[in-house]
Amino acid sequence: MKSALFTFLIGWSLSTLAVEHPTDVYWGDTHVHTALSGDAFANGTRLEPLSAYQFARGEEVKTSTGQTARLTRSLDFIVVADHGNNIGAAYSRHELEDNPDFRDSKLGKAWLAARLALANGHIDEKALTEGSLLPAHRSWQISVRYPLFRSLVWERIGEIADQFNEPGRFTAFIGYEWTPSFEEGRAEHRVILFRDSASLTDQVLPFTSYDSAHVEDLWSFLSRYEAKTGG
């Protein structure tokens, strides 16, 4: 009797566990940097998010060193989480010098406009404050804050993620990294991932530590995003 009761209880417990706790395991990466991140670019990365998604899905890609690489098992999901600060700046400066077609692209024109604005000593003070274009000596650090440039980079990130997202097969999360300055030896980086498509994420720009280095302000931004988009 005790044996039968024990078997019943164990069977009931396991069935309950299976219902209450999902048992599927998914493999992915939530912290991937591409050439759009200044640190990755400085370390030699020249691949854009497109290549990151191809690699994650098990496709063969050519690395920044010219070699080919392929995963033995494709991932189930990925978050391309490039740094929100200076996103696309180093990459755009490089493309402007080495890629003649970049100058005529929307992103290239926005990058040039940002550089011209910074070179103008009589730049409209209103544009500086309302456009989040803060004065400093390092143009690469400010140019990315030029609103049109930032929005074009962010829209491109969302566009590529949506292109590779296949519900039920492969999940491409739109995201970025919020990167505050080092404080008391702690960076406290946060990877922000959205469950939404670009139709919603395009309604905002990534909130960075240029906007605020306090994580509570980041949470407030995300709350405003939810209220605005329903995402």
List PLM regions with ranges.
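Sec-dependent N-terminal signal peptides
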Residues: 3-12
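Extended, charged catalytic domains and RNA/DNA-binding interfaces, predominantly
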Residues: 19-231
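N-terminal signal peptide c-region/cleavage motif recognized by signal peptidases
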Residues: 13-18
